[in-house]
C-alpha cells in the first residue's frame, strides 16, 4: 500500500518530503487526484512544477528505448553494457539520483574509469574549491531558525529560486532575524520577503561587481578600511560590517549557481568574513544549492573514495581535476567517447546534445530527447514519488528520508546500475 492509500481504498493526503529542491521541505503533503498529484499546505512553485511532471496514478509503465525503438528492459541493459564496454573514456553526468543510486554508480565508475560530473557541477565546485583551500564555517537550517539574528543574503534573494527558504528560517515570526540583501545598484528591486509579512527587507547596495563588494566587506569586518573611504560604497559596507560584529549570530547566505565565473574567490572572501567574526561572536555561512542529487552524489563519492566529484578512477589511481573534468568542456573537446546521463527527478536537466553513444536513465518524460541511433533510454523511478530513498539537504549534514507516494512500476537508478554492472561483468567474461 502506498503512502497515499488507506485501507478503504480512499486516496488521502500524506506527509511528504519534497525532492525537487535542496531544502527538502517536509512540512506539507500531497493528494493523489485523477489527473495527477496535488500539493497541499504550500504554494511553493518548485514543488508544484515538480509534481506536475507526474501523471495519473494509473499511467502505463513506459518501455525502454534502444536506437529510439521500444524494447524490453533486458535488451536495453545489454545495449548499455555494450556501449560502456566499448568506451575508452566514458563520462557520467547529470547524477540526478539518491544515496542508493550514487552508491551503485561509484563501483560502475571505478570499473569503467569514468569521469563523474553532476549537472551544475561548476556551481558545486565553487564551494568545494574554497573549502579545500581555506576551510569554512557552515550552519544548518535549524540553527539559522533558532539562533540567527542577522541574515545577509549575498547578491540575490534566495526566495526567488527557493520559495520556502525564508519561511524555513522563521522570517516573519516574532523575535526572529533581520534580513539584509547585499545587492548591486544596477539590480532590480526585490519582491517582498514573505507573503503577509510587513517587516520588509533591508537592502545594502554597492557599485561595481560582487568580487569588489565581498572583498571590501571582508576588509571592513577585519578593520582594514581607513576613514577616507567612509563616504562611498565602503561607508554602507562599513555600517553592515559593524552590524555583523554587533550581532549574536550572523549568517551569510549565498547561491553558488548565481555567482559569476571564478565565484570561488567570492566564497573565499565570505569565508574570511565568517572566520574574522568568529573571533569575538558567532557567524556562519549557508550555501544554497546541490539540487537534483548533486550534493548527494558528491557526499557519497567523497565518503567512498576520499575525493569529491570531478574525479576519475584511472589506472594510475584516483585523479581529481576540478577544472579539467568539467562535463561541458570534455564534451566540447571530444575528450570522452560515451555518456551516461542520470536524471531521475524530472525532465530537467536534460542530457546535452551530442553525437556520442548515450545511455540515459531518467524520468519517462525524457524519452523524446533520447532518440536516434547510438542511444539507450531506460525510464527510472523518482525518489520521493515512485520509490523510497534518501537525499542530503543543502546544509550538508542532514540526510532526509524520502517516502514513496505510489508504486510507479519503474526500477530505481540503483537497481538499473546494479543490473548494468552485472551485464558488464558478463561482457568481460
Predicted regions, residues:
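N-terminal export/assembly segments and adjacent metallocofactor-ligating motifs
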Residues: 1-220, 256, 422-429
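Intrinsic-disorder/low-complexity coil detector
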Residues: 14, 59-63, 307, 378, ...
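Non-catalytic alpha/beta scaffold blocks inside enzyme catalytic domains
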Residues: 128-281, 313-429
Amino acid at each position: 500500500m502506498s503512502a497515499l492509500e488507506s485501507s478503504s481504498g480512499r486516496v488521502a493526503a500524506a506527509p511528504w518530503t519534497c525532492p525537487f529542491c535542496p531544502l527538502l521541505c517536509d512540512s506539507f503533503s500531497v493528494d493523489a487526484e485523477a489527473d495527477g498529484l496535488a500539493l497541499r499546505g504550500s504554494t511553493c512553485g518548485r514543488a508544484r512544477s515538480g509534481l506536475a511532471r507526474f501523471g495519473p496514478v494509473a499511467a502505463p509503465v513506459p518501455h525502454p528505448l534502444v536506437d529510439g525503438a521500444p524494447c524490453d528492459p533486458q535488451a536495453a541493459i545489454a545495449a548499455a553494457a555494450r556501449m560502456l564496454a566499448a568506451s575508452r573514456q566514458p563520462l557520467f553526468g547529470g547524477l540526478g539520483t539518491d544515496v542508493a543510486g550514487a552508491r551503485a554508480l561509484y563501483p560502475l565508475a571505478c570499473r569503467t574509469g569514468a569521469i563523474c560530473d553532476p549537472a551544475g557541477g561548476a556551481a558545486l565546485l565553487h564551494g568545494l574549491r574554497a573549502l579545500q583551500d581555506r576551510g569554512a564555517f557552515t550552519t544548518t537550517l535549524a540553527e539559522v531558525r533558532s539562533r540567527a539574528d542577522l541574515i545577509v543574503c549575498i547578491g540575490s534573494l534566495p526566495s526567488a529560486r527557493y520559495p520556502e527558504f525564508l519561511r524555513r528560517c522563521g522570517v516573519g515570526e516574532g523575535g526572529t532575524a533581520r534580513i539584509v540583501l547585499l545587492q548591486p545598484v544596477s539590480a532590480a528591486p526585490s519582491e517582498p520577503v514573505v507573503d503577509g509579512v510587513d517587516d520588509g527587507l533591508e537592502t545594502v547596495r554597492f557599485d561595481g561587481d560582487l568580487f569588489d563588494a565581498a572583498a571590501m566587506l571582508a576588509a571592513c569586518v577585519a578593520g582594514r578600511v581607513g576613514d577616507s573611504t567612509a563616504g562611498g560604497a565602503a561607508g554602507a559596507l562599513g555600517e553592515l560590517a559593524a552590524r555583523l560584529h554587533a550581532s549574536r549570530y550572523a549568517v551569510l547566505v549565498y547561491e553558488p549557481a548565481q555567482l559569476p565565473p571564478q565565484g570561488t574567490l567570492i566564497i573565499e572572501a565570505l569565508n574570511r568574513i565568517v572566520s574574522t567574526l568568529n573571533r569575538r561572536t558567532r557567524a556562519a555561512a549557508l550555501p544554497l544549492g546541490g539540487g537534483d542529487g548533486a550534493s548527494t552524489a558528491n557526499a557519497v563519492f567523497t565518503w567512498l573514495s576520499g575525493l569529491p566529484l570531478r574525479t576519475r578512477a584511472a589506472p594510475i589511481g584516483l585523479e581529481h581535476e576540478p577544472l579539467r573534468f568539467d562535463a561541458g568542456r570534455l564534451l566540447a573537446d571530444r575528450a570522452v567517447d560515451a555518456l551516461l546521463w542520470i536524471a531521475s527527478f524530472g525532465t530537467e536537466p536534460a542530457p546535452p546534445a551530442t553525437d556520442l553513444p548515450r545511455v540515459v536513465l531518467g524520468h519517462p518524460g525524457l524519452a523524446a530527447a533520447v532518440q536516434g541511433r547510438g542511444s539507450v533510454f531506460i525510464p527510472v523511478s523518482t525518489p520521493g514519488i515512485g520509490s523510497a530513498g534518501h537525499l542530503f539537504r543543502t546544509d550538508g549534514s542532514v540526510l532526509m528520508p524520502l517516502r514513496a507516494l505510489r508504486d510507479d512500476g519503474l526500477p530505481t537508478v540503483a537497481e538499473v546500475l546494479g543490473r548494468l554492472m552485472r551485464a558488464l561483468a558478463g561482457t568481460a567474461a
